Amino acid sequence: MDFAIRSDNPEKYRGDCIVVGVFESRKLTEAARVLDEAGKGHLGRIVDQGDMDGRANTTLLLHGISGIDSKRVLLIGLGKEEEFGEKVFLDVVRTTFKALQPTGAKDVGLYLTELTVKGRDVAWNVLQTVILAEESAYRFDRLKSKPEGRQPSLAKVDIGITDTSTAAAVETALQQGLAIAHGMKVTKDLGNLAPNICTPSYLAGQAEEMARTFNLKFSVLEEKDMEELGMGALLAVARGSHQPAKLIVLEYHGGKDSEKPVALVGKGVTFDAGGISLKPAAEMDEMKYDMGGAASVFGTLTAVAELKLPINVIGVIPTTENLPGGNATKPGDVVTSLSGQTIEILNTDAEGRLILCDALAYTERYDPEVVVDIATLTGACVVALGHVVSGVMGNDEPLVQELLQAGEQTYDRAWHLPLFDEYQEQLKSNFADTANIGSRWGGAITAACFLSRFTKKFRWAHLDIAGTAWKSGKEKGATGRPVPLLTQFLISRANKH
């Protein structure tokens, strides 16, 4: 999909459809008022007659209005003007693109982004509009013999911005929105693939291809390399599967050679049956999404590379399956991690932290400025926070705040959970340095406490995306989160330099 910024008045737009808004008081927006004048009061009469009362997310499609060059006019209800905030704006934009899909319109003039959204500016409106436009066109039907349903026809979106003083900020927002949307698509495509296709070896192949596309440095550790290094925790998870584990590293060098990199470490369990601690059968198919952290690293690096950010970023992806089998790790087994710490594996379904602890220890050799791990780590985080926000914890408060702010900026929000020393008590083992699980209480926190034991040598934060990486039910599929948060985090860091 192509995007462009238009600075002329809406009545001059000649495309297939033009979109303007109406508030619940039956008040036309400024763009709608200008169109109404060109159409000799036609829009005003429609509104006065009650065909469009302005209730949020109601739509009315009009055709062939005399005096208006566009073939169609889509009126979209904005709700009460005094309540027009972030969520309402985002819902309205989603509704707009959904309403456009069956029209056959190929190019659209959108005059919603100059509306006043509480606490936001026009650039934010544009960035979100671009992301939502691309999201509305997303389809994942590559595994079907025949694509179902009508394919999206919309090819171009012209975003109306009459205030030319915002032109530079708006153009930047447009490019950032496109890069984020492209990164989210990469993340969703990887997540939505069937687990018999998206294996650790497949991810390694995709990483190598991505490295060629964006001139990244690619390397991969095979199981024999991990054995030589002493990655006993990662290998313990892989033992039940015939698919070999991998540890993938992608390096983006956009900053100075002297600048330390930001490291993103993404959990890549391409299918998690739980191992010997077998999961219930219900919804086990969704455990293909347990590589959402890894997928988000792919997506974020895509966005960073497209934007050519002046920053150094390293993506570290430990990837394996977690399956039962005759050679699988058993509850009670004790393994030695890369850090030298021994771990009593009380539950083989607490596997994400096992592969991450070795990946985090491995990341030390890159002397990172900061490290952020991203993982669909715990059901406990979903219980605590639902599917609205991700959980964030860490050993460095400024870093945690950077991530929280990036989430607020992009509306890909996170919530700060505590990491108090008292929680560490739950991880005591009678037979090893640490156990891989605690009690049933505070599970998202104790999982992060476990990881914190392998992050003593760098500034670190942990994003638990178990509730935000995918949707269940009728709209089942990967969400592309937290690519917006991570990309904004890196944009902000690059801007500081």
Swiss-Prot record:
Catalyzed reactions per annotation: Release of an N-terminal amino acid, Xaa-|-Yaa-, in which Xaa is preferably Leu, but may be other amino acids including Pro although not Arg or Lys, and Yaa may be Pro. Amino acid amides and methyl esters are also readily hydrolyzed, but rates on arylamides are exceedingly low; Release of an N-terminal amino acid, preferentially leucine, but not glutamic or aspartic acids
Q: What class of enzyme is it?
A: hydrolase
UniProt-annotated binding residues for Mn(2+) 1: 272, 349, 351
Q: Which GO terms describe its cellular component?
A: cytoplasm
| Origin superkingdom | Bacteria
Task: Give the EC number(s) under which this enzyme is classified.
Answer: 3.4.11.1, 3.4.11.10
Q: Name one Pfam family in it.
A: Peptidase_M17_N
Subcellular location, record wording: Cytoplasm
A molecular-function term among this protein's GO annotations: manganese ion binding
**Active site residues according to the UniProt entry:** 279, 353
Q: What does the record say about how the cofactor binds?
A: Binds 2 manganese ions per subunit.
Provide the GO biological process annotations.
proteolysis
Q: Which InterPro entries match?
A: Leucine_aapep/pepB (IPR011356), Macro_dom-like (IPR043472), Peptidase_M17_C (IPR000819), Peptidase_M17_leu_NH2_pept (IPR023042), Peptidase_M17_N (IPR008283)
In terms of NCBIfam families, this protein maps to: PRK00913.1-2, PRK00913.1-4, PRK00913.2-4
PANTHER family named among the record's database cross-references:
CYTOSOL AMINOPEPTIDASE (PTHR11963:SF23), LEUCINE AMINOPEPTIDASE-RELATED (PTHR11963)
Q: What is this protein called?
A: Probable cytosol aminopeptidase
Q: Provide the species name.
A: Nitrosomonas europaea (strain ATCC 19718 / CIP 103999 / KCTC 2705 / NBRC 14298)
> Species lineage, top-down?
Bacteria, Pseudomonadati, Pseudomonadota, Betaproteobacteria, Nitrosomonadales
State the gene name recorded for this protein: pepA
